């Protein structure tokens, strides 16, 4: 006898389900209810025979991953989070979802305070609309804002305009974060935080903090970690190089087991052997990011990041003075690249784009793995590793091409 099926119940059957703890896969069934994962079964679920065909989706052994989590991304699909209006934000979020990313932290580069406040207001308005039925399955989830500027070291500014940088002022930061509670993560050059007040204030406001765009010595970085910083923004990039007489922030991060290290695995930002070094030392705290900019998913040409002109050629973005200006990487490609560069399993690489970023920004109890109680964010892959279907909050976006550019 078939059981009465609650509204919004679906059993995904005959799947190769990702196991975050084992960094591997097992054949089983996944029961979803009300936008959440209700049950994960190894083998055939006892519920399978009791449910009507309409409530069972047999995926034919396809791989089912948690939705990917990108916590450092400035934009894609022709839009930048710093300037995008409501319509462009919808286009961008649809493009993220189609690529397999179900959760994003819109990342804002350095700008004047008024411009940052306005960008966060627009992003907040977009996030507030997520419960609208008309948007179900149409876009990735916004989990808060990553504030990458303005508190950076001018000597390691990268593509950030120097006139937009500011000293590390704890009072300014607190006013900023209290007025804009959507900021979840802050990048800062913490060697400029002489008395530690900036870091303490950020933590007291509920943000996580990463060291980045920094000239920090080994000792300065270790002090920042001891005081509460939990991550290093795009390891190796916009930091002093690893040196045998001065390890610097890179060495400090690699030797600190509890510090998350972000990597851009596009084959351009970091040499494969340096990716392998980080993978060997970091394991659970290696976090794949894209640092993507508006040209992602678009042809080569002229673009902008943080108001600065950027030329994209052969998929590589540079400012006119030659600085690397973000990437055009998709996170799923980053997963594949990481596995190839570091010589790790696909399952290990998936962890770095799902559970590890969720841990970095304090979202591991909500997303990042396929466990009961977590949000039903899924990525189902074809045999060739491309997205077959993407689900966000229990709703499929339909064809993986929907919203793509």
Where are these regions (language model features)?
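N-terminal metal-binding scaffold of metallo-dependent hydrolase/deaminase domains
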Residues: 4-49, 391
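Alpha-helical scaffold segments that flank or form the walls of functional sites
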Residues: 62-63, 71, 81-140, 164-179, ...
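Divalent metal-dependent hydrolysis catalytic cores, especially in the metallo-beta-lactamase
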Residues: 74, 90-122, 140-153, 180-191, ...
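Active-site gating loops and adjacent loop-to-helix segments of metal-dependent hydrolytic enzymes
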Residues: 94-105, 153-180, 223-235, 239, ...
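Active-site core of metal-dependent hydrolases
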Residues: 174, 178-298
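His/Asp/Glu-enriched, well-ordered alpha-helical/loop segment
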Residues: 248-261, 279-381
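C-terminal cap of metal-dependent C-N hydrolases
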Residues: 359, 369-405
């Amino acid at each position: 006898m078939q059981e009465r099926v609650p509204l919004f119940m679906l059993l995904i059957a005959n799947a190769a389900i990702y196991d975050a703890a084992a960094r591997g896969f097992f054949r089983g069934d996944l029961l979803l209810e009300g936008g959440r994962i209700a049950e994960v079964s190894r083998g055939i679920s006892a519920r399978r025979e009791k449910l009507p065909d309409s409530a069972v989706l047999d995926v034919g052994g396809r791989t089912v991953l948690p939705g990917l989590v990108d916590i450092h991304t400035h934009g894609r699909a022709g839009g930048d989070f710093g300037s995008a209006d409501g319509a462009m934000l919808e286009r961008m979020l649809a493009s993220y979802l189609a690529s397999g990313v179900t959760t994003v932290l819109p990342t804002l580069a350095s700008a004047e305070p008024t411009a940052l406040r306005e960008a966060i207001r627009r992003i907040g308005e977009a996030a507030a609309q997520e419960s609208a039925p008309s948007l179900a399955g149409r876009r990735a989830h916004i989990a808060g804002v990553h504030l990458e500027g303005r508190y950076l070291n001018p000597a390691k500014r990268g593509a950030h305009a120097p006139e937009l940088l500011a000293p590390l002022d704890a009072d300014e930061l607190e006013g900023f974060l209290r007025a804009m509670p959507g900021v979840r993560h802050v990048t800062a050059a913490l060697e400029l935080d002489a008395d530690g007040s900036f870091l303490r204030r950020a933590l007291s406001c509920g943000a996580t903090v990463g060291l980045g765009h920094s000239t920090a010595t080994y000792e300065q970085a270790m002090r920042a970690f001891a005081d509460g910083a939990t991550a290093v923004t795009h390891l190796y990039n916009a930091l002093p190089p690893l040196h045998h007489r001065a390890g610097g922030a890179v060495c400090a991060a690699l030797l600190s087991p509890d510090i998350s290290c972000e990597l851009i695995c596009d084959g351009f930002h970091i040499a494969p052997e340096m990716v392998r070094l980080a993978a060997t030392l970091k394991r659970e705290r290696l976090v794949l990011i894209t640092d993507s900019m508006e040209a992602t998913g678009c042809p080569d040409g002229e673009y902008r990041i943080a108001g600065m002109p950027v030329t994209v050629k052969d998929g590589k973005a540079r400012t006119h003075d030659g600085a690397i200006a973000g990437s055009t990487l998709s996170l799923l490609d980053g997963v594949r690249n990481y596995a190839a560069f570091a010589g790790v399993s696909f399952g290990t690489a998936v962890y770095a784009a799902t559970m590890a970023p969720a841990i970095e920004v304090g979202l591991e109890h909500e997303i990042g793995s396929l466990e009961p109680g977590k949000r039903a964010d899924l990525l189902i892959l074809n045999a060739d590793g491309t997205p077959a279907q993407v689900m966000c909050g229990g709703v499929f976006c339909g064809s993986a091409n929907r919203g793509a550019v």
